[in-house]
Amino acid sequence: MKYLVLVLCLTSCACRDIGLWTFRYVYNESDNVVFSPYGLTSALSVLRIAAGGNTKREIDVPESVVEDSDAFLALRELFVDASVPLRPEFTAEFSSRFNTSVQRVTFNSENVKDVINSYVKDKTGGDVPRVLDASLDRDTKMLLLSSVRMKTSWRHVFDPSFTTDQPFYSGNVTYKVRMMNKIDTLKTETFTLRNVGYSVTELPYKRRQTAMLLVVPDDLGEIVRALDLSLVRFWIRNMRKDVCQVVMPKFSVESVLDLRDALQRLGVRDAFDPSRADFGQASPSNDLYVTKVLQTSKIEADERGTTASSDTAITLIPRNALTAIVANKPFMFLIYHKPTTTVLFMGTITKGEKVIYDTEGRDDVVSSV
């Protein structure tokens, strides 16, 4: 039995709720996490056109397309071993739907990893220099790559001169982080969920089709467990403009996530079963199944956003007139496409780099904020 490896690589943003539900299983209360619901569902949409029968029914992800731009680019590539016969109608649909062609490679060759890495590096203009570190299993016959990249700056940047070292409180540990600070007119609101209070604030990007939702709760885990698309849309509908002082850490997070277990718990099972997988829509041999679903995601947030910008808008008003949004404890962020409410990237920040106080005596951490 041959098998297919599904690899998702993202660097930095609805899909059916499967993307948000998956985050419930990859969330880690003791570490920072970044994940792309759109990256996962866009890859599954490719897999779905190759599937038939119950395998197709389980991969139930409707199309949710965010148009490419110089600020946002989604890349889907399919690498197929030269020995695997493909149905012409499948290759035609793949090329038509995703504006690229199936790439033929020899997976049992010694340089296949370098060939794929070089191809992706060229296609992304160097933004994704490497997608494969370890060698692939020599029995691999297909590899699906989904790459989602977003580069944009805040509509109103944070002034770097206001960035200072501040405490970040997480459980029994206090970290020292670089905390950004600005005053702006933003959409914000305070909500309550299962007796957990939390605020949601929208931080718009310069390109107005995307924005970040900053969610600062009293109990982050409770919000993660309740998260779905209807809740996100509820936030968006009910936020109101207010003059806010936003205090949040600069952060850089990279996550490598194995999504197989999460997808199986959400009902995508036949695709991973050698005896039940049906990918006969792609190949008449119909002897493929999925063994891996890996997603590598990265995001950076600083005073400018993710690219340089000269916009600065700081308004001085009486401090007692401000709504204070202070993310000095574990929080969630979601970057979404406003026309479609598609969640492109999301993540949680639960720790900083340097411990300055620990009631349990720990004195070291490895993640960076």
UniProtKB/Swiss-Prot annotation:
Presence of keyword RNA-binding: no
InterPro entries: Serpin_CS, Serpin_dom, Serpin_fam, Serpin_sf, Serpin_sf_1, Serpin_sf_2
Biological processes, Gene Ontology terms: negative regulation of plasminogen activation; negative regulation of vascular wound healing
SMART domains in UniProt: SERPIN (SM00093)
GO cellular component: extracellular space
Alphabetic keyword roster: Protease inhibitor, Serine protease inhibitor, Virulence
GO molecular function, one term: serine-type endopeptidase inhibitor activity
The organism's place on the tree of life at top rank: Viruses
Residues with site note (Reactive bond): 319-320
Keyword DNA repair appears in the UniProt entry: no
SUPFAM superfamilies registered for this protein in UniProt: Serpins
Function description: Important in virulence.
Family named by the database record: Belongs to the serpin family. Poxviruses subfamily.
PANTHER family: PLASMINOGEN ACTIVATOR INHIBITOR 1, SERINE PROTEASE INHIBITOR, SERPIN
Protein name: Serine proteinase inhibitor 1
Annotated source species: Myxoma virus (strain Lausanne)
